[in-house]
Amino acid sequence: MRYFPINLDLRGKPVVIVGGGAVAARKCLALLAAGARVTVIAPTLASPVNEVAENGVLIHLARKYSKGDLAGASLAFAATDNRTINRAVANEARLNGIPADIVDAPELGNFTSPAVISRGDLLITVSTGGESPALARKVRMELEKRYGPEYAVLIKILGKVREKLLTEKANSPYNKKILNQLVEQDLAELLKKSSVAEIDNLLRKLCGPGFSLAELGIGEKDKE
């Protein structure tokens, strides 16, 4: 295994993307969703990133990359169709100790971006180490079918239950038993069916009074 998997907290961190095509756009949107401060360097931007740039959510430098553009960056991405530019980005990143993902030549960078399935706080990633993005996409699509939008609500419910249990009864073996039992239940299927009464009954049966969806603060908006 060449790469070590890691989740980075990029909230408020400066990230530079060199390139404005479809690949760069996907990375840009994912980084913005993670709270990064994104600068994109490219003569033009693909949709929908061009609309995002017009709203001032990111910085767009409408030109080609120049040496020194990575100054102050926490991460860098090279996603152009010009290998010379991508290699120049890789060189600048390496000389300045900036982690870089070089899309067309992962061996020049020191990390790669996996295919991602995001269901709220449930994050599933698939990586082939840059060997086969096509296979990573295929596996991602299979996982997307297996883990639908209901899992975003499920993880929220589990988090609320855990928080309430820890607050009321501390981190006891009893709590761990309840949480383990809860994840073995078919809550995801009940969420797909919007079976609120059944979910409430199950939560109260396992966790006791005060653990209905409403009492946990899970409303209709969360279930959309």
Language-model segments: what does each one mean?
Residues 53-71:
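Glycine-rich, highly charged phosphate/nucleotide-binding loops
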Residues 1-44, 49-53:
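Hydrophobic, well-ordered beta-alpha structural blocks that scaffold small-molecule cofactor pockets
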Residues 102-152:
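E1/E1-like adenylate-forming module used to activate ubiquitin-like modifiers
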Residues 21-23, 84, 130:
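Residue-level detector of alpha-helix initiation sites
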Residues 42, 60-64, 104:
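Short loop/edge segments at beta-strand edges and connector loops
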Residues 130-224:
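An accessory alpha-helical subdomain
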Residues 75-81, 86-112:
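ADP-ribose/adenylate-binding Rossmann-like module
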